[in-house]
């Protein structure tokens, strides 16, 4: 049981790291001397050093991506907190439904954000020299991992430690 708890805790922390990195790092779109994320657009030198950054546009779709990414981080942090609370207060044989629910919500939020960004980013950057950066890919990787950990939480029963 202890190994199972450590495994699910490791998976949850990995999802949290992926969500934080994908929300913060300026690598959602990468192009010729430019990097773009949810918050700003930056120009870079040939060596990769950031030269100038300016705020991203204020379009509604980008604000919805920003909001859903922030919600995914909040839901995942809340799920981790609830997991620790339930670990010490849940009766033997009880399931971690609330923790699983919030972790699944985090997964659905990050999926929504990445899907909206996928569909709408072409309006923002009509230049075809852009490709998806690693932060965008990390957001998509966080989606199935968050769903998986949420499902594991729902299935998991508390036993004796």
Swiss-Prot record:
Subcellular location: Cell membrane
Major localization listed first in the record, in broad terms: membrane
GO CC, any one term: membrane
Domain of life: Eukaryota
Transmembrane residue ranges: 2-31, 65-91, 96-119, 134-156
One protein family per Pfam: PMP22_Claudin
Alphabetized InterPro entries for the sequence: PMP-22/EMP/MP20-like, PMP22, PMP22/EMP/MP20/Claudin, PMP22_EMP_MP20
GO BP field: actin cytoskeleton organization; adult locomotory behavior; adult walking behavior; aggresome assembly; autophagy; axon development; basement membrane organization; cell adhesion
Gene3D superfamilies named in the record: 1.20.140.150
Extracellular compartment segments: 32-64, 120-133
PROSITE patterns noted in UniProt: PMP22_1, PMP22_2
Topology within the bilayer: Multi-pass membrane protein
Tissues where the protein occurs: Schwann cells of the peripheral nervous system. Expressed at growth arrest of mammalian fibroblasts.
Glycosylation sites: 41
Keywords: Cell cycle, Cell membrane, Disease variant, Glycoprotein, Growth arrest, Membrane, Transmembrane, Transmembrane helix, Ubl conjugation
Family statement drawn from the similarity comment of this UniProt entry: Belongs to the PMP-22/EMP/MP20 family.
Function: Might be involved in growth regulation, and in myelinization in the peripheral nervous system.
Disease: A defect in Pmp-22 is the cause of trembler (tr) phenotype. Trembler mice show a Schwann cells defect characterized by severe hypomyelination and continuing Schwann cells proliferation throughout life.
Protein name: Peripheral myelin protein 22
């Amino acid at each position: 049981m202890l190994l199972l708890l450590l495994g699910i805790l490791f998976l949850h922390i990995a999802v949290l790291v992926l969500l934080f990195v994908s929300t913060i790092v300026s690598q959602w779109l990468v192009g010729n001397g430019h990097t773009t994320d949810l918050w700003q657009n930056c120009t870079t030198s040939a060596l990769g050093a950031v030269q100038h950054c300016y705020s991203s546009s204020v379009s509604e779709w980008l604000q919805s991506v920003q909001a859903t990414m922030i919600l995914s981080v909040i839901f995942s942090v809340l799920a981790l907190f609830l997991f620790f609370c339930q670990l010490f207060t849940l009766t033997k044989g009880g399931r971690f439904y609330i923790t699983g629910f919030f972790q699944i919500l985090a997964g659905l939020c990050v999926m929504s954000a990445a899907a909206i960004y996928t569909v709408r980013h072409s309006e923002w950057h009509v230049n075809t020299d852009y490709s998806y950066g690693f932060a965008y890919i990390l957001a998509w990787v966080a989606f199935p991992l968050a769903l998986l950990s949420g499902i594991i939480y729902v299935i998991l029963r508390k036993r004796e430690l």
